[in-house]
C-alpha cells in the first residue's frame, strides 16, 4: 500500500466502521481464544526440506496495540484473535494446534494414539503441529485422520502426519464424509487455474502481511506455502447418526453436504460432550459464494443443518470447537452462538429471496439488505470472510443465474470496448478522471472507482488513471471489515502499479493427480483443447491402462475432444501403459516413450493449450 489517500472522508469512514461494530469492551472472545494455552514453537519459522520458509509464526507480531489508520478496527480485532498460535487444551482429551496454517488441527487422545481432525494445508505445517503435540503431551502415533470436508486446508497436510503405507496396511484409519474424494479433486481440476489466479487476490498471497498489507484472511492468518498432499479415505461416513469407536473413542457424525463444502460433516464426542462443527459455524459470516470462484452454496441448507445440530447436540454439548478460530464453552453460550449463527444464514437467504421476488436484482439486493441488530451486534456474525453484500448476490445467482431479465443485458459489449465508448461519450479520459477526483473528494468512493475503472479498462496505459484507481483501492482496503475484501482491493492496487507478476503454470500435486479419476482427467484435456490448433483436423487414440483395468478412446473431431470408456470397434491408434506414465506425459510434460503409437498421442496432445496462470484482472 503506497501513501494512503487521506482526508476527512476516510477518517469518518473508519470511525463509522468502528461505531457500527459490536462492543469492543466485550472480551469474551479473547478469553476463549487464550484459554487452555500450553505452548508454541520456539522457532517461529516452519521450513520445507529445501530450507524454504512455508509458514512464519512471527509474521503477525505487528498485531499489537490499537488499530492503525490503515486497518478497519473490527478487522484488526479479529486478526489479533486469530494470531494466537500454539497448542491449546480444549477439554479433557482434546487439544488444538491453532495458528500454524489457515485452519486448526484438532488432536483427540485415543487409547494408543492421536485421532487428528483436519491435518492442515501442507505437510510441513502438519508435521510441525504433530511435533509440538508430541513434545508437550508425550509421543504417540497418529491412529486416525478425520477430514471434516473437501477443501484442501483440511486435508492437504495428511502426509505430514501419517505414512500412506501405514494407511494401506490398515494401521491408520482415514475417515471422511461421503463424496469427499470426488469433490476434493474435482474442485481443483476443471476450473483450477482460474480459481488459483483469483485466490491470489482473495488471500493477498503476493503481498507482505502487515498494517499496509493482508491483515489475516478472516478465518485464519493465511495459507501456508508448503507441500500439499492427499491420503485417500479408508472409511466413508454415509449417514447422520453413524457412530464409530476409533482407538477407544466414541465418535458420532452429522452429514452436512451443501453447506460450506459439497462434502462436509460435523463430529460429536458423546463421552466428552464436545462438538466439532467443522466449518459450519466459524467466528465470522462465511462465504456462500467464495470470491476465488466455486459453485454457489445453499444458505437455506446451511441454516437447516445448524438447526439439526442444535436438535441433535444442543442440550448435551459443553464444548464447541471448529476447524477455524477458537472454541466456545458453556451449554447456554454454545446454543445461543449456533442459533444466532443459523439465524444469520436464514435471514440472508429468506430476505434475499423476498427482495428477488419483488423484482430486485443482485446488486440492488446487496445495497439494501441489512442484518437485524440482534444478529449484527454479535462479533461472530460480522463479515470478516464472507459478507452480507456478496452473499446476497450469491443467493440471487443460485436461483436466477447471472441474467437480470433486462434485455439490455442479453448481449453486452466486452468491458474494454464498452468502457472506451463510455469514456469517449463523457468527454475523454481527462474529464472522466476529473469527475472521479471530485467523487473521491466528496467521499463517494464507489463512484470514483466506477469512473476510474472505465478509464483503465479502456486504456491500460493511462498511468494517471491507474495510480488514482490504485489509491482508491488502498483507501477501500483500509476501510474494509472483510479481510478478503481488503486483500482483493490491495492486490488490485499492486497490480495497477506494478503489473502482474509472472506466474508459473498451476500444477496439481502428485497425490491429487493420482486420486483423480481418469474420466475427470480426460474432461480436463477437453477444456484445454484450442480450436485454432485442431482446426480441420481429426485424431483418435485408445488409452489402455492395464494397472487399473481401464480402456478409453479419446477423439478430436469438429474441434471438440470427446472420450468413451470400453469402446467398440478397432482403434486407429493405441497406447498401452501404466496410468502414472500417461499422467507424466500428458500433465507434467515428462519426455517418456510410451508403448504403442506414441506419435498419435503426441499429435492429439499438440491440440491442447496449457492454462494461462497470470491473466490480467484489473486491466484488459
What do these predicted ranges mean?
Residues 163-217, 229, 258:
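Surface-exposed loop and adjacent secondary-structure segments within mature catalytic domains
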Residues 87, 112-113, 123-175:
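Active-site metal-binding motif and surrounding structural segment of the metallo-beta-lactamase
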Residues 113-115, 121-123, 225, 229-235, ...:
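Metallo-beta-lactamase
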Residues 21-76, 192-223, 311-319, 326-519:
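Accessory terminal helices/loops
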Residues 80-140, 264-269, 273-279:
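Conserved beta-strand hairpin/beta-sheet module of binuclear metal-dependent hydrolase folds
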Residues 6-18:
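Hydrophobic helical h-region of N-terminal Sec-dependent signal peptides
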Residues 93, 108, 118, 133, ...:
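Divalent metal-coordination and catalytic microenvironments
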Residues 435-438, 444-450, 454-457, 461, ...:
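Feature captures hydrophobic
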Amino acid at each position: 500500500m503506497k501513501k494512503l489517500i487521506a482526508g476527512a472522508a476516510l477518517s469518518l469512514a473508519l470511525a463509522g466502521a468502528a461505531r457500527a461494530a459490536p462492543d469492543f469492551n466485550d472480551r469474551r472472545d479473547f478469553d476463549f481464544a487464550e484459554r487452555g494455552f500450553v505452548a508454541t514453537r520456539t522457532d517461529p519459522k516452519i521450513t520445507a526440506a529445501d530450507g524454504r520458509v512455508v509458514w512464519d509464526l512471527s509474521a503477525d507480531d505487528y498485531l499489537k496495540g490499537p488499530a492503525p489508520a490503515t486497518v478497519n478496527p473490527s478487522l484488526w480485532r479479529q486478526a489479533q484473535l486469530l494470531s494466537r498460535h500454539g497448542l491449546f487444551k480444549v477439554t479433557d482429551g482434546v487439544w488444538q494446534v491453532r495458528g500454524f496454517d489457515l485452519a486448526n488441527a484438532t488432536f483427540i487422545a485415543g487409547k494408543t494414539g492421536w485421532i487428528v481432525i483436519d491435518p492442515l494445508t501442507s505437510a510441513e505445517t502438519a508435521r510441525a503441529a504433530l511435533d509440538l503435540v508430541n513434545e508437550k503431551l508425550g509421543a504417540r502415533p497418529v491412529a486416525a485422520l478425520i477430514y471434516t470436508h473437501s477443501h484442501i486446508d483440511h486435508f492437504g497436510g495428511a502426509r505430514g502426519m501419517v505414512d500412506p503405507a501405514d494407511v494401506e496396511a490398515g494401521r491408520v484409519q482415514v475417515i471422511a464424509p461421503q463424496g469427499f474424494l470426488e469433490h476434493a479433486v474435482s474442485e481443483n481440476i476443471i476450473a483450477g487455474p482460474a480459481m488459483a489466479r483469483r485466490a491470489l487476490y482473495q488471500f493477498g498471497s503476493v503481498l507482505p502481511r502487515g498494517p499496509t498489507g493482508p491483515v489475516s484472511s478472516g478465518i485464519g492468518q493465511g495459507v501456508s506455502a508448503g507441500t500439499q498432499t492427499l491420503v485417500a479415505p479408508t472409511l466413508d461416513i454415509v449417514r447422520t447418526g453413524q457412530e464409530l469407536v476409533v482407538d477407544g473413542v466414541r465418535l458420532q457424525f452429522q452429514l452436512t453436504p451443501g453447506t460450506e463444502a459439497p462434502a462436509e460433516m460435523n463430529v460429536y464426542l458423546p463421552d466428552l460432550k464436545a462438538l466439532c462443527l467443522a466449518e459450519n459455524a466459524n467466528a465470522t459470516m462465511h462465504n456462500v459464494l467464495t470470491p476465488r470462484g466455486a459453485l454457489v452454496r445453499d444458505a437455506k441448507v446451511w441454516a437447516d443443518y445448524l438447526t439439526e445440530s442444535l436438535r441433535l447436540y444442543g442440550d448435551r454439548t459443553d464444548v464447541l470447537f471448529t476447524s477455524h478460530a477458537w472454541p466456545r464453552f458453556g451449554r447456554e453460550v454454545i446454543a445461543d452462538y449456533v442459533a444466532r449463527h443459523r439465524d444469520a444464514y436464514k435471514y440472508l437467504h429468506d430476505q434475499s429471496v423476498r427482495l428477488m421476488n419483488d423484482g430486485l436484482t443482485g446488486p440492488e439486493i446487496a445495497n439494501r439488505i441489512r442484518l437485524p441488530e440482534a444478529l449484527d451486534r454479535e462479533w461472530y456474525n460480522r463479515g470478516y470472510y464472507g459478507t452480507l453484500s456478496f452473499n446476497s448476490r450469491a443467493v440471487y445467482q443460485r436461483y436466477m443465474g447471472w441474467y437480470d431479465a433486462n434485455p439490455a443485458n442479453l448481449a453486452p459489449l466486452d468491458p474494454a470496448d464498452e468502457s472506451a465508448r463510455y469514456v469517449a461519450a463523457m468527454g475523454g479520459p481527462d474529464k472522466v478522471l476529473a469527475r472521479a477526483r471530485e467523487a473521491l473528494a466528496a467521499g463517494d468512493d464507489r463512484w470514483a472507482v466506477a469512473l476510474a475503472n472505465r478509464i483503465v479498462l479502456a486504456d491500460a496505459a493511462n498511468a494517471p488513471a491507474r495510480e488514482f484507481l490504485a489509491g482508491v483501492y488502498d483507501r477501500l482496503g483500509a476501510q474494509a471489515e472483510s479481510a478478503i475484501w481488503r486483500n482483493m482491493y490491495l492486490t488490485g492496487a499492486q497490480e495497477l502499479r506494478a503489473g502482474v507478476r509472472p506466474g508459473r503454470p498451476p500444477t496439481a500435486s502428485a497425490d491429487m493427480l493420482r486420486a483423480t479419476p481418469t474420466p475427470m482427467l480426460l474432461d480436463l484435456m477437453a477444456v484445454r483443447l484450442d480450436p485454432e490448433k485442431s482446426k480441420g483436423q481429426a485424431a483418435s487414440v485408445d488409452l489402455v491402462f492395464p494397472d487399473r483395468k481401464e480402456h478409453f478412446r479419446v477423439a478430436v473431431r469438429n474441434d471438440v475432444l470427446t472420450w468413451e470408456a470400453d469402446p467398440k470397434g478397432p482403434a486407429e491408434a493405441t497406447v498401452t501403459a501404466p496410468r502414472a506414465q500417461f499422467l507424466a506425459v500428458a500433465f507434467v510434460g515428462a519426455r517418456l516413450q510410451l508403448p504403442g503409437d506414441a506419435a498419435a498421442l503426441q499429435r492429439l496432445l499438440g491440440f491442447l493449450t496449457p492454462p494461462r496462470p497470470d491473466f490480467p484482472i484489473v486491466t484488459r
